[in-house]
Amino acid sequence: MRTAQVSRNTLETEITVSLNLDGSGTSRLATGVPFLDHMLDQIARHGLIDLDIAAKGDLHIDAHHTVEDTGITLGQAFAKALADKKGIRRYGHAYVPLDEALSRVVIDLSGRPGLEYHVDYTRARIGDFDVDLFLEFFRGFVNHAGVTLHIDNLRGINAHHQAETIFKAFGRALRMAVETDARLGDVTPSTKGAL
């Protein structure tokens, strides 16, 4: 089983992430940021990743540190669970619609952090959640998972729908990329022989 548990403790946050890449999509999420929990649940359900995240952060200031550090810790756990990446498909992609909204996510588990994030939300907040924090979440994930990630919201009017299509597509792209391919066996999917 490809599993990992990582804890990150700073003066701003205390976060523990446990995940199983070969799970069934169950989640237990308690970040203290309800809309973030809702989006993390999309990753679990659509990625078939069992995800347990507990976070305590300086929410009396705002959600920035909690959201960013959750992305960082999730990225660290993801990298640890993938280990040497032998036999994985490596690349994943997904288009996901939700009513009027449509997003595309493409990922390469390359070992090289890179983020292209092209999302123009139709409003700055979803409830009391600042949508700018999603960029911080994905930047934290990418830098600590060592992946290249392209996120494009192609259209959308409802900001909630825009965010949800992004996270659903992210989960589905992850699911595709981490799948093992029996034809690869123990081969690393790179001409360099390592990722």
UniProtKB/Swiss-Prot annotation:
Pfam families, sorted: IGPD
Gene Ontology biological-process entries: L-histidine biosynthetic process
InterPro entries tied to this protein: IGPD_sf (IPR038494), ImidazoleglycerolP_deHydtase (IPR000807), ImidazoleglycerP_deHydtase_CS (IPR020565), Ribosomal_Su5_D2-typ_SF (IPR020568)
Record's keyword terms, sorted: Amino-acid biosynthesis, Cytoplasm, Histidine biosynthesis, Lyase
Reactions the enzyme catalyzes: D-erythro-1-(imidazol-4-yl)glycerol 3-phosphate = 3-(imidazol-4-yl)-2-oxopropyl phosphate + H2O
Residues of the signal peptide: none
Pathway participation: Amino-acid biosynthesis; L-histidine biosynthesis; L-histidine from 5-phospho-alpha-D-ribose 1-diphosphate: step 6/9
Record-level Gene Ontology MF annotations: imidazoleglycerol-phosphate dehydratase activity
Matches recorded under SUPFAM superfamilies: Ribosomal protein S5 domain 2-like
Keyword Methyltransferase tagged: no
GO cellular component, one term: cytoplasm
Protein EC: 4.2.1.19
Subcellular location: Cytoplasm
Entry's family note: Belongs to the imidazoleglycerol-phosphate dehydratase family.
This protein's name: Imidazoleglycerol-phosphate dehydratase
